[in-house]
Amino acid sequence: RGLTRQVSAALSQWGIIPDDSAGMPLHLSPPGRLLRQALGILGKGVSTPTLLALLKHPLAHSGGARNEHLLLTRDLELYLRAKAIPFPQSAGLQAWAQKQNNPMALSWAGWVSDICAAHWPADSAPFADLLSQHLTYAEAICRGSRPDEDDEAGGLWQQKAGRQARETVKALRAAAASAAAVLPFDYAGVFNGVLAQNEVRDRDAPHPKILIWGTLEARVQGSDLLILAGLNEGVWPQVPPPDPWLNRRLRHEAGLLLPERRIGLSAHDFQQAIAAGQVWLTRSVRNDEAQTIPARWVNRLTNLLNGLPENGGAQAFSAMRARGDAYLKRVESFESWQPAPAALRPAPAPPKAVRPQKLSVTEIKTLIRDPYAIYAKHVLGLAPLEPIEPVPDSRLRGVIYHALMEQFIKAWPDCAPVDRRRRFVEISEALLCAQVPWPSHQAFWRSRLRAMADWVIAEEERRQTRGQPLVLEGRGAVLLPELQFTLSAIVDRIDMSQGAELYLYDYKTGAVPTPDQQKVFDKQLYLLAAIAQQGGFETLQPGEVVEAAFIGLGAAKKYQAAPFDKEPLAQAWEKFKHLIASYQSEETGFQARRALFRVEDYSPYDQLSRCGEWSLSAPARHEVLK
């Protein structure tokens, strides 16, 4: 059956559906797939990938307003990707629907919420009840939020496959009356097994001249061209199944047939088939694991012909191979391609009017290391899609740690010294429960946070002696009037001493930039300090920043101050203005991967820049755009 599916998939390139004598397995038909998807959600709950796969099924919401359903599904997918929501909930879906400019959005979101909320009973239940709940749920999915009149199940039970599925379900429902109570897990196994045992054949849809036969059908039917496929040992003939109870001698004494009888029947089928008018003998040279071995009768035929040179056997065999090679070359021509010239390293130079006039502090590092990413994001307006299945990655860990430090610092004045660790643990636990719905990562991050609690408290006591927190997660911006450029930022924390001196901190859960990196590439602390000194942050008057530092919250707990002694803040600010002025000039191109930290570092726009077709040592192609 695997070879049949491969051949059918290849023929689908030309819109050809072969007439398969075995039909399509019912569980692989559209109704079968939807019933199994519904079964999976009832048993395991809904996640973003499973929900989107269900909503995009061709039978989902087939009862009416299918076009609006597909439009809303697309918008919902973009929302779930952007917000990195692993498990959609009713409240979030309703909040999203209220922001949509679509009169159908609210009712549609309610329908999706019902899909997400469905689940099996906790304990065992009568088989008939589980079957009724399953079918009612599947019909509601197909009916949709705005069904047509007298439409109870959309297209679920329509077409040949739908009618066959309905007959199978009727037979199962009749047998369910005498079944005992079962667990939902056992019901799922029975239902999937029943679907897999049934097949669907549509005599009208397939091509009338392309047929896929089994050995039984090939014995009694003829064709103009017969292709004998899968001629490898273990496929044709198949390996006899092992008998765990009787060996060959005992089987013979009991009067049972030996396993080798099946090989004899396969040889008989091959002998009949190869006598057709025109025959192709085909086999795969490799499978998933290693080289394959030709079937024994192919080897026998090869040896026989090559062993009869005086009778023209070798010439006949060579002619057979030549005719086969001619067809193989045709197949290879379908897949041939003309090599395209390798792209040059791009460095587009767009007009000044479309160049970015506002960047955030964190984007300045990208502008220095990979200017092409800034061009793609701000000039072309391209943003990479988030993965369809959110994962608890370093970005989420950073969000958790930043929120923890913000809430903990706010609660610091009201906590007695003996209660600080307890308060730290309470805040971390609330954040993990609310934003990390993966139990394994919850446990792992919980252990790391509790292990660092004493260090955080001790370091915080030291920092509180120098100044009091004045700004937490504060937004700010500063305008460069001579360049008409705005630099925006979000600062994690700014403290003020009694002498009105400012201490600026930024939390890092990953690697902390070294002083040399801060001088050249990572200018975050310098730029935050410059904005603070100019009074660019809300609720903060201009003041002198005497120290700006990264606080490492990762495995290596590190405190790294900006090297103001090696490069004064005023000097760094002048360099920044020169950088912005350079990229506002139409002579400067946004070069791809200009100075990434490591060669293997990934940029979300590598595919757009055709990275891999050019080397990092290659000169950039400066292209002035109009």
Question: In which residue ranges do the predicted regions lie?
Answer:
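Short beta-strand or tight-loop elements
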Residues: 206-211, 266, 468-476, 485-491, ...
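Metal-dependent nuclease catalytic regions and adjoining charged, substrate-binding loops involved
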Residues: 310-314, 318-321, 328, 532-626
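Non-catalytic protein-protein interaction segments used by genome-maintenance enzymes to assemble
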Residues: 471-536
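Polyanion-engaging groove/track-forming segments
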Residues: 1-415, 429-435, 439-442, 601-610
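A short catalytic or substrate-binding loop motif that flags glycine-/basic-rich loops and adjacent residues
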Residues: 204-207, 219, 449, 482-488
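Metal-dependent nuclease catalytic cores in nucleic-acid-processing enzymes
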Residues: 218, 261-280, 516-551, 580-584
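Feature representing long, continuous alpha-helical segments
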Residues: 33, 189, 193, 374, ...
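A non-catalytic, helix-rich entry segment at domain boundaries
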Residues: 400-475, 479-481, 562-563
